[in-house]
Amino acid sequence: MKITTIAKTSLALGLLTTGVITTTTQAANATTLSSTKVEAPQSTPPSTKIEAPQSKPNATTPPSTKVEAPQQTANATTPPSTKVTTPPSTNTPQPMQSTKSDTPQSPTTKQVPTEINPKFKDLRAYYTKPSLEFKNEIGIILKKWTTIRFMNVVPDYFIYKIALVGKDDKKYGEGVHRNVDVFVVLEENNYNLEKYSVGGITKSNSKKVDHKAGVRITKEDNKGTISHDVSEFKITKEQISLKELDFKLRKQLIEKNNLYGNVGSGKIVIKMKNGGKYTFELHKKLQENRMADVIDGTNIDNIEVNIK
């Protein structure tokens, strides 16, 4: 852990002195691409020389099964031809892959096109995007070079530029910021940046957090039918941004309650133990300035959702 911290700190200092962020990103991407291209041909040649039709399905399985198969066929080339076609290794990966990838994807891909209302298309597309979570990172803030300032986060030598909006603009000054967590959702921007996100910056945990907040859901569909549901929302942070709360809750509602299918209005209300509350309006995306707001995750009491 100390070596990783030293490496990231040295990289942070390099960014502060040079400011050449684009070049670093291109170099990191170039090294990543070249490394993956070299590894791919190494796994295929030894298997295709012995048995062309049977080595291809085994290429996706662990390399240990590839070594054992050619040794058995080399000892008995004529009689045990059936042993090669019916080993347990060929039967094992097929059911595993079908249950992991096909089962969860098939119901969603079949239902989504028939149930999505066109006016909710953009909201559903945004809240089903993949998200990233970086913890205990180093954030670097350089001098302002455009209309907005950025915190540069460098996990695994890829640079993510986090727009400092709302309260973050005054909260974080220029320099190096340690022990930073960032919740990232890549967004379109006017700065030609590939890895760009807004808000979602919090302080790293000082202790382990395992908190669950109850979620009560009331949904009225386009036919007037009202249904009720109860679930939980897991919180593992002392500090959590409204960006992360809003995104994860809506994504959970899309997956379990078909939010932005045929209905997409209503609100989410976060109720705190001290009596406070925070509201997300479902008919529109969370405002950018609120994406920087941070609350005490352990102080969340319960969550109420009304969809209509």
UniProtKB/Swiss-Prot annotation:
One matching Pfam family: Stap_Strp_tox_C
Composition bias, Polar residues: 33-47, 55-76, 94-114
Stored InterPro entries: Enterotoxin (IPR008992), SSL_OB (IPR015282), Staph/Strept_toxin_CS (IPR006126), Staph_exotoxin (IPR008375), SuperAg_toxin_C (IPR016091), Superantigen_bac (IPR013307), Toxin_b-grasp_Staph/Strep (IPR006123)
Localisation per UniProt entry: Secreted
Keywords: Secreted, Signal, Virulence
GO cellular component: extracellular region
Chain spans, region Sialyl Lewis X-binding: 180-278
Region (Disordered): 32-117
Organism superkingdom: Bacteria
SUPFAM superfamilies for the chain: Bacterial enterotoxins (SSF50203), Superantigen toxins, C-terminal domain (SSF54334)
Chain intervals with Low complexity compositional bias: 77-93
Span of the signal peptide: 1-30
Function (record text): Secreted protein that plays a role in immune innate response inhibition by interfering with host TLR2-mediated pathway.
Description of its domains: The C-terminal domain contains a V-shape binding site for sialyl Lewis X.
Family: Belongs to the staphylococcal/streptococcal toxin family.
Protein's UniProt name: Staphylococcal superantigen-like 4
